[in-house]
Every structure is written in C-alpha cells, then in structure tokens.
Amino acid sequence: MTTLTAPVTPRERVTRLAAGRIAALQRGYLDDQSHAVAALARLRRGAGREAGQLPDLWALIDTGPLHETPDGARPLSESELVRAEDALHVALTLYALHQQSRRTGMYQADRPDRRRGVGAAVRRMMKPGEIDEAVHKRLVRAGTAPDLAVLAQRLRDIVVLLRREDIELDHALLAGQLYTWQWPGGADTVRREWGRSFHAWHDKSKDGAPASAGSDTTRSTDTDKDAS
C-alpha cells in the first residue's frame, strides 16, 4: 500500500529554512569562526527593522530555497514569497541579537518535553508560581501588534530580556509563526500558540513530571568577541 505524504506547507518551508540557517550560524559562532561572528554582527543591525531597509543583509538571509519547488509541492506565489522573506528577516535578526555575547546557544528547538516557544520563554523569566505583570504585559503587547513592523520591535524588546536571563528560544518556530501572522486571521492563530506555550512552559523529566526551570539550561557567561 502506498502511503500518501502531505505536501509541505509554506509555513513549514519557512520554519525548516530558518532552522537550518540559524543552526549553522550558531555552530559557527560558538566555534568562534570569524565569518559567523561577522555575520551575526551584521544581522543584529537589522533587528526590529524592516527587511528592505538593509539591502546588505540580503546575502546573509538566503531565501533561494523558497524559490525552488520540492517534490509534491507547488511553487510559492509572490505574496507567499514576500511574507516568507519578511518572516525570515525578522527571525534571523532577532536570533543574532539574542546570541550576542552568549557562550551557549540561544537557539533551541521546541519539543513536547522542552518548550522553547515565545510564550514559554516569557514565562521562564518569571518566578515559579508567580506572574510578573510587567513581563507578561510585554507578551500581550507583542500579541496585539497591528503589523509585522511593530511586532518585530516588540519582539526585539522581549529578546533583549531573554538574552539578559540566558533563556533560549526556538527562533525557527518563531519564523513560521511570523509567516502565519501576516495572513488574515493569522495573528489570532499565533496568539493562541503563544498562549499554549506560556502555560506549558515547564520542562518535563523522563518520567513526565515537570523539571525545575533551570535543570536543562547551562548558565553562560558573557563574551566580548562581538560586543559591538
């Protein structure tokens, strides 16, 4: 019997492309490879800014795979390409800002036993059993952003706080969410995802019980190799 495989959605393509690019940058940065350190320094300048404002970043944010057509998939339309490119720009520049001066990888993939979505990351900034209203308000403000440009600015503010606390994030998952955000009804979908992530923030041990907030995280110290 032949098993039919569902075609890869545009959002999945954005997420996978972001994951591959960010993982490569992170490996290079943590290995102190000069090209990766320089690339992240350039990308940081784009955090919170629109993709078209910094043409010199186009070579760093390679969207070429989006113009290809995987087996069983259809070519992306012009409107899909524009939204995908904008989502990748925001996600990669936010990752570059997040990773600055960190000795451990700030990008970690979200998993059922280790949530690393935006909501979970914000929740991890709070003490267990307490809701920090000031921090929570930042998530709410991001969720009510009127457009992608404002959302990028508000996410930038959140990422600065996450970096300060050494809290990881799945920036590739975020890239897919940013793609979805730009479509009618997409903001509602992403807000629901962030809300679920916020309430499922605990890491889980092998027996399924919640682990302590810091059990999975190796605390890092600052490095000045890219302090600019």
Predicted regions, residues:
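Alpha-helical oligomerization segments
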Residues: 163-228
